[in-house]
Amino acid sequence: MSGHKCYSWELQDRFAQDKSVVNKMQQKYWETKQAFIKATGKKEDEHVVASDADLDAKLELFHSIQRTCLDLSKAIVLYQKRICFLSQEENELGKFLRSQGFQDKTRAGKMMQATGKALCFSSQQRLALRNPLCRFHQEVETFRHRAISDTWLTVNRMEQYRTEYRGALLWMKDVSQELDPDLYKQMEKFRKVQTQVRLAKKNFDKLKMDVCQKVDLLGASRCNLLSHMLATYQTTLLHFWEKTSHTMAAIHESFKGYQPYEFTTLKSLQDPMKKLVEKEGKKTSWRENREAVAPEPRQLISLEDEHKDSSAYKTEEGTSVLSSVDKGSVHDTCSGPIDELLDGKPEEACLGPTAGTPEPESGDKDDLLLLNEIFSTSCLDEGEFSREWAAVFGDDQLKEPAPMGAQGEPDPKPQIGSGFLPSQLLDQNMKDLQASLQEPAKAASDLTAWFSLFADLDPLSNPDAVGKTDKEHELLNA
């Protein structure tokens, strides 16, 4: 027994109890409860959380490094594609300028050729930037897949032991509530849980230290990687700009003394079909605006047509009125009142209108002569009555002087044209009508001659002759 270690049965029973199924189930229960509390975001013990503040800061830095390295890798890939596209477009522009320069034999053609060569050279030198970028991308991917992945595994194990440790703390807190040191009640159970807490804390502290060290090393290695790779890229970029600027400066020196040109850059190229569509759209809008400005649509009964019809009707009515006046005037001339006939101007009353009629043309003379014959037959002839009239009253009244104008001059006759047109007849009738309307009413005729004519039959019929003593009245009175 001297060469062997001896353990009491109490310790052996305790060791066997720790390995029992019940102990494992209790341990898993509290670990699961802690994981559930963390997943649901429930509030934990503030002292336990404060003890892991430095670890949480390191974890935050680790997640930042992981995220930024992923973004950097994507940006490098996109930057390489953009450089390739830019070099391709620059090369195409250089070729285009060279081809146009060969066709142009002026100084502008030489300038385009030189500029095209410079652009082609610049595009080739720009592709040299892809080498350090490709190397940079490979280093970043290696850093992500090696250093960050290893640190991530360590962090995951540390999180597992931290959950186990905090679960053991919850278990010990629950057992301590039933502990009674005076009665030694639950003492063995409390000691067993306390031992489990110490073991979990030991494992957790070890992994906590590993995580902090790896995160610090990861940050430093990332700084070294960026400084090394960016220095290579910076050197290549400086060489590229140096060569390009030297080439451009040489071309600029060769262009001195050339006549400057003013170039207009087209911002966008329009398709001919698009121009046609825009032109048609402008025409349509112009038509719509013109229709909007145009007057309202015509009414069912046009006022202008009605006005024209009324004016035509008035014209026809005026013509008919004048014609009726003309006919009426001829009739009235021949069949006037008896007072005018007895006024001493029977021939003038009948022959007056015919004397003022214009002489028609050769084609209408027959009609005019026929009308004159008709009118003359209807009037009083110079028969016995005319001769008797002249014997009694005399021939002075038939030879009246022509009417004088306002200034003592005779009334000028209207100039009769050689034609006998309807328009001239209408004008003549209008003038006669106006003259007849403007003439004042004639004074009452002297009826003495009339009473003298019938004095033989009735001497007392003339009241004006009563009391007169001249020879004529004495003869009548006798």
Swiss-Prot record:
The keyword Translocase does not apply. Gene3D superfamilies: Arfaptin homology (AH) domain/BAR domain. The keyword Cytoplasm applies. Residues 306-317 have a biased composition (Basic and acidic residues). Keywords: Cytoplasm, Cytoplasmic vesicle, Golgi apparatus, Membrane, Neurotransmitter transport, Synapse, Transport. Predominantly expressed in brain, pancreas and stomach mucosa. High expression also found in stomach muscle and testis. GO terms for cellular component: cytosol; Golgi membrane; secretory granule membrane; synaptic vesicle membrane. InterPro entries: AH/BAR_dom_sf, AH_dom, Islet_autoAg_Ica1/Ica1-like, Islet_autoAg_Ica1_C. Residues 50-253 form the AH domain. Residues 306-365, 398-422 are annotated as: Disordered. PANTHER family: ISLET CELL AUTOANTIGEN 1. This is Islet cell autoantigen 1. It comes from Mus musculus.
